[in-house]
Structure formats: C-alpha cells, structure tokens
Design a protein with these regions (language model features):
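Carbohydrate transferase catalytic cores enriched for Leloir-type hexosyltransferases
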Residues: 1-204
Length: 204
C-alpha cells in the first residue's frame, strides 16, 4: 500500500503532545514496516527530527498558514502522489480529499463550551478552525482513531457517530519514561502524605 501521513508540525522546535504521538508513530513504522510505502507530509521547520528511509519519504510542503497548508497544499500533494489512504494525525483534515481518510481524533474539547477565553490570537483562531472543520470531516472518514475507550465513549455520545467508525488505540510511551526512585525528603516538602496522586493535564 501507499500510505500518506499528515504530520505537519513535527519539525517545529516546541512540539505539543499530538506532534510527539505522530513523530513516535512514524519512527516505529520505520523500524517495523518495510513493505508499505509511506509519504510523510510536513511543514518546514528548524527541528529536522525525522529522515527519509527506504520506504518512508519525507515531503515538505510550504504554505503561509495552517488552514491553507491543510486545505490547499495537502490535498494537492495527495492528489499528485495518489496514495491508497491519507492518515491525518491531529484532529483536523482536508474538507475535500481524493483518497480514503483516516483521522486521529485526540479529543473534542474545542467542541465543548469554553470555561475560559484567555487564549492568544493564535489559539483563538485554532479553536474556531477546529470547531468549523471537525464536524464536517468526521462523516467523510473511513475510520477514526481516538486515544482511549473513555474518549471514544465521549465522542460517540457527543457526536452520534456509527460505533464501527471509531476505534480506541492507546498511545505508547517513550523509553525515557520510567519509575523514579522515591525521594521522600523532597516530596514531603510539598505533600504531607505517604500516598498521593500527582496529576498534570487538562481540566475536562
């Protein structure tokens, strides 16, 4: 198969969570799959953290803005490559795509009522873009991947998609994540308890 993967922002220096998921997935595919041919579409950036290999081709697409990159440059590139499918990795995708579409939908926070409006101009535009694009592309997707059974349930309840369209595939974890030795002298300075749960994440 010829498989196209959108990984637009993985070359930017300050990567976000979705960028790392896409990057590590592609790295693992490079190690594991030497039969299918992959075309990775990326926006140019300073951190060239991925190189082409035998069956994995890095294709840089230049475009001034994210929406134009995704809605104009990406579909044109896909049309010229003629892959068997396009996998978009970060919640959004082209509204018009000439090949079957697979989408990774990490969450639907942007479709819910906002608790705060203290966003930068860039974040504000991204929020509106996702609200506009996501509901329109979901019916066109052959398959939608989300990151947990919990998120799958939330998406099904909120958007009433066919159950067979949406699958949960849990993220892997990098080998640099491991259990740290206990350091009670440090933790007791901040948490006066033997057992505790320290959580970092969104508020949804």
């Amino acid at each position: 198969m010829k498989i196209a993967i959108e990984a637009q922002r993985i070359f930017r220096p300050n990567k976000h969570g979705m960028d790392f998921v896409a990057l590590e997935t592609i790295r693992e595919l490079q190690k594991m799959d030497h039969e299918n041919e992959y075309f990775i579409f990326i926006s140019p950036g300073e951190d060239r953290c991925l190189e082409s290999s035998g069956n994995v081709h890095i294709i840089e697409l230049k475009c001034p803005t994210y929406p134009l990159w995704e809605q104009v440059a990406l579909p044109q590139a896909v049309k010229s490559i003629k892959p068997d499918l396009l996998h978009c990795t970060s919640n959004t995708a082209p509204l018009h795509c000439s090949v079957p579409l697979v989408l990774t939908l990490h969450d639907i926070i942007y479709l819910e009522k906002r608790q705060s409006s203290s966003l930068s101009w860039y974040q504000e535009m991204g929020w509106h873009y996702r609200r506009l694009v996501v509901p329109r592309i979901l019916p066109k997707c052959k398959k939608i991947i989300t990151v947990s059974l919990f998120e799958r349930k939330r998406i099904l309840e909120a958007l009433h998609l066919p159950e067979e369209q949406l699958v949960a595939v849990y993220n892997g974890f990098n080998s640099h994540f491991h259990l740290q030795p206990k350091a009670p002298k440090i933790t007791r300075k901040y948490i006066d308890a033997e057992n505790y749960l320290f959580f970092l994440g969104n508020t949804d």
